[in-house]
Design a protein with these regions (language model features):
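Beta1/beta-strand and adjacent pyrophosphate-binding region of the FAD-binding site
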Residues: 1-12
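Glycine-rich flavin
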Residues: 2-4, 21-27, 33-134
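The conserved SAM/SAH-binding core of class I Rossmann-like methyltransferase domains
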Residues: 9, 32-33
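N-terminal Rossmann-fold NAD(P) dinucleotide-binding loop
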Residues: 15-16
Length: 134
């Protein structure tokens, strides 16, 4: 069983900020995220940012090809590709901000509580048990 001062479940805005703050205070911190495709949380990956990127692209298409829906539809694949590139860039930045920091260990998998201070992480067929103080 691996021991940590704190175990943070979720690599979203709150989780990543709390993890970084505790690590700066020399706490040994584990952060758990279900999927590498969600580093940075909902806003970065499937919420605010991709939605706003697609809205921006659609507004551009409408201005450029006002009533020409055939040409607007051609820009759809390009808009999705740009959105995907932006999300991938931001996800990677979030990962880089954590991966090289001392005192932080990132785990990919589904976390569940075994007790008040004990967490089980399941990733495929692998299972890891962590114990935290806080």
């Amino acid at each position: 069983m691996k021991q940590y001062d704190a175990i943070i479940i979720g690599f979203g805005k709150g989780g990543k900020l709390l993890t970084a703050e505790l690590a700066e205070r020399n706490w040994k911190v584990a952060i758990v995220e279900r999927s590498p495709q969600m580093y940075g949380g909902t806003c970065v990956n499937v919420g605010c940012i991709p939605t706003k990127a697609l809205i921006h692209e659609s507004e551009y298409a409408e201005k450029r090809y006002y009533d020409d829906y055939k040409n607007q539809s051609k820009l759809y694949a390009l808009a999705v590709a740009r959105k995907d590139k932006l999300v991938s860039f931001l996800r990677e930045k979030n990962y880089e901000n954590v991966k090289n920091k001392p005192n932080i260990t990132l785990y990919d998998g589904t976390a569940s509580f075994l007790s008040e201070n004990t967490i089980r992480i399941v990733s495929g067929k692998d299972e890891t048990i962590l114990e935290g103080k806080e």
